[in-house]
Amino acid sequence: MRSIVRISLFLTLLTLSGTNIFGHDKQDTIKTPPQGRTAVMIEPAFTINPAKTAVLIMDYENDIVDMLPEDVRGPLLERAGTILKGARQAKLQIIYVVVRFRDGYPEVNLQNKLFSGLKQSGRLVEGTPGAEIDSRVAPQPGDIVVTKRRAGAFSTTDLETILRSKNISKLVLFGISTSGVVLSTVRWAADMDYSLAIVSDACADRDPEVNRVLMDKVFPWQATVVTSREFLKAIGAQDIK
């Protein structure tokens, strides 16, 4: 027991001191800061190989989009549409991820705190207008639609099979909400060693502070956080309006 405690304290002290215990070399993406300063990331140049990249637009369904304030909803959809237009111009694979349930919600366990409330709401039921993707960012021929039953894009779907079959190794993703589908998908994809980019101004959350903390403090450890303008520049999109 004492040995376990000593090891635990040792690892804790190393973590707090910023010491690297994972054997990375000098080109690691994290620098140990001088005393009294905040750790900073060293981001590589943001580049995209269209043949190896997929764009994931997640949970842009009417029932979800309509929960956002109008002053957020309109600009968000406009930016999302611009991103998709640029991605199609650059011939990137676009994948829509949607959350839908059968009538009566047989997929929802009452112990699932996130989804159990849906049974009373009537939202996101297959075949209803609310479960459809917003017409302003509707899929086009060649796009793929993946249906999920839980928060993340990988859980309960065949997304991983699709990505592997297309030899996709980089994901550019955005969605609603930041603390829901985006967070869940980033965590899962990072653990599977995908290269990740998050388009920050095409994500939204009902709590702006949660959105800010995730974008500024959490996601940069596992993904490159970019704006829609930076993404379009990286893919060489021209005359996108």
Stretch-by-stretch model annotation:
Residues Y60, V99-F101, D201:
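Active-site loop/turn elements of alpha/beta-hydrolase fold enzymes
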Residues F22-A54, T82-A90, L114-K241:
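Active-site-adjacent betaalpha module
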Residues E107-L114:
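Short, flexible, mixed-charge acidic loops at enzyme active sites
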